[in-house]
């Protein structure tokens, strides 16, 4: 019996010893374990959020696609309608040659499929010459307080960082948020130092609460130990304390000694925690510096969102408004350029005022202007100071349409990419007028008094990057000489051009579009070698000239040929036979084509490639031969002719079982008796709704 009792007592001692050792694990180690768990949980949460974000971004919605917009807090709130769901549009007579389908928006030419945002709430797309715009759809917020950030239209929670944070940063500091450089500059560091992230403060609070709870538990343990003491030990302690007090050597009790020791340990722990926090912050800063931002995107804040800086006040004249970085004073009845001091402004609109002069100091307070619109004013050449634009080192777009200029302003910034001086009274362009504009891409000089007599052949030589030149509504009789080799699109409509010589396009090997409508060109005044060797020329518009035949010696690379409103009576045989890959769009509306003006070889070389053929408003009495052999044809106009009968095999080939690619067939306003058309005449066309037969003329 005694052996069993001793054995149990021995086991009890071993158990208490092990339990005490487990309780005496250093608190510093426990804190490290606790912080390690916090880090693991935070990283796992980040991974989960990243996975969720990736899933949301790759999800495809049908039938209407939506493009999610990811905010700075990695939430997805705003959604835009996709432009891919817009239906196709039938061709019209207002054809812009070239496959690109450009759009003209506020005087700016947008290429096909270009996407831009004219306002913070709107996104637009150029689709085959049409401008399609969508407004942002804002999802409701479930937070108690919402705010609409500057430059945006959807409300966000007040604790969510907005784009206005970036709007308060100067343009020169924008690179710190992009992927162009892995080094961060001082403004970013200052931004983080001035507003410490809340997550660090939360970690400190959690640590202090954990330490406080540990100390409370220790105090409770001490109280329970004191309560467990026997009365004898209490009496002994009282006698001991009384003896000490009588002797004058007052000593502290064991509980007080423990408390003092705990206080010292607590101070040591706090010092160690401060050192650990400083080390952790240093490690986090190093991790932030080592984490490069890739891609052309804004850098996201590494911690919690930062509040937006206060907006500064800017005094504007009556009738003017401020939108993000644009000051708009359209039709504000201004007589002079207002004195403004706003380095953050990048766009200034002064359209439709009565401004007559531009002094040298007009834009001193707007050094970062990128776009300046001075159209529809009364500005004269003598009223522009010689240094008016000299300080605008970042100016890229200048619009001076609809003024009273007689010459191009001098000392324009070399950063200009677009210059518009349409509808003025320009009398000449000399060799120095466009000097130093080697970055200019677009030049528009329509509606002036320019001709080959007052335009120096060397005037366009400095324009090494020029791709888009508009010289319509002037007085040219020949193609201007000295065009730069970089030119891609040339517009010379509404002039008095009579001929096209062999040397006109000798140095313009990149030219893609030539528009010469509303001139006086005859087919025998087009030199055989004028453009036949052009390898990139795809679109030619010779509408409303004096052509009697489809011109020969057309470029091999031609895809679009627009010949509306001439007096064409015949399409010569094999005129398209040399083209590669082949003509795709041929517009011959409003001419004088008759049945004897076309035969089967007239379209030789284009049977495999022709997609649109316009033969409306002519003198045809029957379906032209070879239509059923045009396998790629999608759009055929034969309306407003004199057609009376449609033979069964003129549209569909009875020997072939495949459906035709025809999507639009116009036969209205002829003399066809619809009831007499055989039922299988249009059997190869997939949908009868694609055929327009009504109304018909009665005679």
Swiss-Prot record:
Residues 176-316 are annotated as: Disordered. It comes from the Eukaryota. Residues 1-20 form the signal peptide. It is found in: Secreted, Extracellular space, Extracellular matrix. A motif (Cell attachment site) lies at residues 294-296. Residues 212-224, 270-291 have a biased composition (Acidic residues). Glycans are attached at residues 378, 449, 506. Residues 307-344 form the LRRNT domain. InterPro entries: ECM2, Leu-rich_rpt, Leu-rich_rpt_4, Leu-rich_rpt_typical-subtyp, LRR_dom_sf, VWF_dom. This is Extracellular matrix protein 2. The lineage of its organism: Eukaryota, Metazoa, Chordata, Craniata, Vertebrata. The gene is ECM2.
């Amino acid at each position: 019996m005694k052996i069993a009792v001793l054995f149990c007592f021995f086991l009890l001692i071993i158990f208490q010893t092990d339990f005490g050792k487990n309780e005496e694990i250093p608190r510093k180690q426990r804190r490290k374990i606790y912080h390690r768990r916090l880090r693991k949980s935070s990283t796992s949460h980040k991974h989960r959020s990243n996975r969720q974000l990736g899933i949301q971004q790759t999800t495809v919605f049908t039938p209407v696609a939506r493009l999610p917009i990811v905010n700075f807090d990695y939430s997805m709130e705003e959604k835009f309608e996709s432009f891919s769901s817009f239906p196709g549009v039938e061709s019209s007579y207002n054809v812009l040659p070239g496959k690109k389908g450009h759009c003209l928006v506020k005087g700016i030419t947008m290429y096909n499929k270009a996407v831009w945002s004219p306002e913070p709430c709107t996104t637009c797309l150029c689709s085959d010459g049409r401008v399609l715009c969508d407004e942002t759809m804002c999802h409701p917020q479930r937070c108690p307080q919402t705010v609409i950030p500057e430059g945006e239209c959807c409300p966000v929670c007040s604790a969510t960082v907005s784009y206005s944070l970036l709007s308060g940063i100067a343009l020169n500091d924008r690179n710190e948020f992009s992927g162009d450089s892995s080094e961060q500059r001082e403004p970013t560091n200052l931004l983080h130092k001035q507003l410490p992230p809340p997550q660090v403060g939360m970690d400190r609070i959690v640590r202090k609460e954990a330490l406080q709870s540990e100390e409370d538990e220790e105090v409770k343990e001490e109280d329970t130990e004191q309560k467990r003491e026997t009365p004898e030990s209490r009496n002994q302690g009282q006698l001991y304390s009384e003896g000490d007090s009588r002797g004058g050597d007052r000593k502290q009790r064991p509980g007080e000694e423990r408390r003092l020791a705990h206080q010292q340990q607590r101070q040591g722990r706090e010092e160690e925690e401060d050192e650990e926090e400083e080390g952790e912050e240093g490690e986090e800063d190093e991790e932030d510096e080592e984490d490069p931002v890739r891609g052309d995107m804004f850098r996201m804040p590494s911690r919690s969102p930062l509040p937006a800086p206060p907006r500064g006040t800017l005094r504007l004249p009556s009738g003017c408004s401020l939108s993000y970085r644009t000051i708009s004073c359209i039709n504000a009845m201004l007589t002079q350029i207002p004195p403004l001091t706003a380095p953050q402004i990048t766009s200034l609109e002064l359209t439709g005022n009565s401004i007559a002069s531009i002094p040298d100091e007009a834009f001193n307070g707007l050094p970062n202007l990128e776009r300046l619109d001075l159209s529809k004013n009364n500005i004269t050449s003598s009223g522009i100071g010689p240094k008016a634009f000299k300080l605008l080192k970042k100016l890229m777009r200048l619009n001076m349409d609809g003024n009273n200029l007689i010459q191009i302003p001098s000392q324009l910034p070399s950063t200009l990419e677009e210059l518009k001086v349409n509808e003025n009274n320009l009398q000449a362009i000399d060799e120095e007028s466009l000097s130093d504009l080697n970055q200019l891409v677009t030049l528009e000089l329509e509606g002036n008094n320019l001709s080959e007599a007052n335009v120096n052949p060397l005037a366009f030589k400095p324009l090494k990057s020029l791709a888009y030149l508009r010289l319509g509504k002037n007085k040219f009789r020949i193609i201007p000489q000295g065009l730069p080799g970089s030119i891609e699109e040339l517009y010379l409509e509404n002039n008095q051009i009579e001929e096209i010589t062999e040397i006109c396009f000798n140095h313009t090997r990149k030219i893609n579009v030539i528009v010469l409508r509303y001139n006086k060109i005859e087919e025998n005044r087009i030199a055989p070698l004028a453009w036949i060797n052009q390898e990139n020329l795809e679109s030619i518009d010779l509408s409303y000239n004096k052509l009697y035949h489809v011109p020969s010696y057309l470029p091999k690379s031609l895809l679009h040929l627009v010949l509306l409103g001439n007096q064409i009576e015949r399409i010569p045989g094999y005129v398209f036979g040399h083209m590669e890959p082949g003509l795709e769009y041929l517009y011959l509306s409003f001419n004088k084509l008759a049945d004897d003006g076309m035969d089967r070889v007239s379209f030789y070389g284009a049977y495999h490639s022709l997609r649109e053929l316009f033969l409306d408003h002519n003198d045809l009495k029957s379906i032209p031969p070879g239509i059923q052999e045009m396998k790629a044809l999608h759009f055929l106009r034969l309306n407003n002719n004199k057609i009376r009968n449609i033979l069964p095999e003129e549209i569909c080939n009875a020997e072939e079982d495949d459906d035709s690619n025809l999507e639009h067939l116009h036969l209205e306003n002829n003399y066809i008796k619809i009831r007499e058309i055989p039922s299988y005449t249009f059997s190869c066309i997939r949908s009868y709704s694609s055929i327009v037969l009504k109304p018909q003329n009665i005679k």
